[in-house]
A protein has these predicted regions:
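Alpha-helix initiation and N-capping motif
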Residues: 20, 86, 149-152
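C-terminal motif of bacterial Sec signal peptides marking the signal peptidase cleavage site
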Residues: 13-16
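Sec-dependent N-terminal signal peptides
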Residues: 6-8
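Positively charged n-region of N-terminal signal peptides that target proteins for export
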Residues: 1-4
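Extracytoplasmic electrostatic interaction patches
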Residues: 105-153
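Contiguous interface-forming segments/domains that mediate binding rather than catalysis
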Residues: 18-28, 94-97, 105-107, 136
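Function-determining sites in protein domains
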Residues: 76-79, 83-110
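Early exported N-terminus immediately downstream of N-terminal targeting peptides
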Residues: 23-89
Length: 153
């Protein structure tokens, strides 16, 4: 009986360790690549003591934790690199946890905004994907707690 319980526990642990691609894994994997530019910004970069803010603006800033930016630079000698990388990011964003908020542009040129959260007023993460085949693309992750898009706009 103890062996069966141990076996079931191990199976549950292995099953819960999903190995599906995520934006976080993609970001970590490509941070050191020479084809990418990576930047992390903390909420402390915004000095609120020198500006006057409304209560709504204060609430928006308090819900913001950090921002991760990952940009892919298109190389004229390697056009297929753009197609491969943008396809990988778009595949990650097709996961059901990412909900599209809006989209602009057409084809490979344009931008889209996604969010992760229980509903559209309690958002944990915003993701902006913008790109142009000739220049490259950028993925911007804005992480926070209970972010509300009406406070940001």
């Amino acid at each position: 009986m103890k062996k069966l319980l141990l076996l079931v526990s191990c199976m549950i642990m292995l099953y819960s360790c999903e190995d599906k691609p995520t934006l976080q894994k993609y970001y970590v994997k490509n941070t050191e690549s020479p084809k990418f530019i990576a930047l992390d910004l903390a909420s402390s970069i915004i000095k609120t003591d020198k500006i006057s803010l409304t209560e709504t603006e204060k609430a928006a800033l308090e819900s913001f934790d950090k921002m991760n930016i990952l940009a892919f630079r298109t190389d004229s000698t390697d056009i297929t690199g753009y197609d491969k990388e943008i396809k990988e990011v778009k595949a990650i964003l097709k996961d059901e946890s990412y909900q599209q908020l809006m989209k602009a542009g057409s084809g490979n040129d344009g931008a889209a905004i996604y969010f992760v959260g229980n509903d559209d007023e309690h958002i944990e993460e915003f993701v902006v994907l913008a790109g142009k085949k000739e220049n490259g693309f950028a993925v911007v992750r804005v992480l926070g707690n209970d972010m509300n898009p009406t406070h940001i706009m």
